[in-house]
Amino acid sequence: FLNPFRWVINKYR
């Protein structure tokens, strides 16, 4: 998994 996906999931949460 890439790092960019980290904030993406955080925002979707």
Swiss-Prot record:
<keyword id="KW-0964">Secreted</keyword>
<dbReference type="GO" id="GO:0005576">
    <property type="term" value="C:extracellular region"/>
</dbReference>
<keyword id="KW-0800">Toxin</keyword>
<dbReference type="GO" id="GO:0090729">
    <property type="term" value="F:toxin activity"/>
</dbReference>
<protein>
    <recommendedName>
        <fullName>Short cationic peptide-6c</fullName>
    </recommendedName>
</protein>
<comment type="similarity">
    <text>Belongs to the cationic peptide 04 (cupiennin) family. 06 subfamily.</text>
</comment>
